[in-house]
């Protein structure tokens, strides 16, 4: 359970959000400090599974053949085989469109080298190289887990944003998501909470509310 300060900040952000004719996301903005973000080892870049879900559809594409492809077809948004990979390698525009439309990629481990060669220049800079699927991994479990995953990534910027829910989720559920993200962040930053300058939560069009 998240602490009351987080839940109160989320409740204020939801209450202060103007009414719109579309479903707004709820986002977290984190401001870092005392880190050399020119050093890749000090940057934030990892996936976090949200206990209450992301509140939105997460687009997942699987690179696979055979039985894995058949099983992935039931849960992934698209399943691509070696022939599809070859086509994408010859069509940079299509590869870029796919990368921009997809949140996460998963690939059978034997395909990773071919994917790196064919799509590395497209997926790499976007931070979207596939998660390797090992022989003992269940593709259905992996995809379902990633549907509730967000990527927290600072790159070389002091401030980064991540989705933590949607406006029709409860403040408690959104706060639980934020709590998991902050705990992971504190555990991985060099100085823990001391490397976090401030944290804000807001809906897409609403005002930012500081999380104490």
Swiss-Prot record:
Record-level Gene Ontology MF annotations: rRNA binding; structural constituent of ribosome; tRNA binding
GO biological process: regulation of translation; translation
Superkingdom of source: Archaea
Function: Binds directly to 23S rRNA. Probably involved in E site tRNA release.
Subunit structure: Part of the 50S ribosomal subunit.
HAMAP family, alphabetized: Ribosomal_uL1_A
Name assigned to this protein: Large ribosomal subunit protein uL1
Gene this protein is translated from: rpl1
């Amino acid at each position: 359970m998240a602490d009351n300060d987080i839940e109160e900040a989320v409740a204020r952000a939801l209450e202060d959000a103007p009414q719109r004719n579309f479903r707004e996301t709820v986002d977290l903005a984190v401001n870092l400090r005392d880190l050399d973000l020119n050093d890749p080892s000090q940057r934030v870049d990892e996936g976090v599974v949200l206990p209450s879900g992301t509140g939105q559809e997460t687009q997942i594409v699987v690179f696979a053949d055979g039985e894995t492809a058949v099983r992935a077809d039931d849960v992934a948004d698209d399943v691509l085989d070696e022939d599809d990979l070859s086509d994408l390698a010859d069509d940079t525009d299509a590869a870029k469109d796919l990368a921009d439309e997809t949140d996460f990629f998963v690939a059978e481990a034997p395909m990773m080298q071919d994917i790196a060669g064919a799509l590395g220049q497209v997926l790499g800079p976007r931070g979207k190289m596939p998660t390797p699927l090992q022989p003992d991994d269940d593709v259905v479990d992996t995809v379902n887990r990633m549907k509730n995953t967000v990527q927290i990534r600072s790159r070389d910027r002091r401030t980064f944003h991540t989705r933590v829910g949607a406006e029709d989720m409860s403040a408690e559920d959104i706060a639980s998501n934020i709590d998991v993200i902050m705990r992971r962040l504190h555990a991985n930053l060099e100085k823990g909470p001391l490397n976090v300058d401030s944290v804000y939560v807001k809906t897409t069009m609403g005002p930012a509310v500081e999380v104490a």
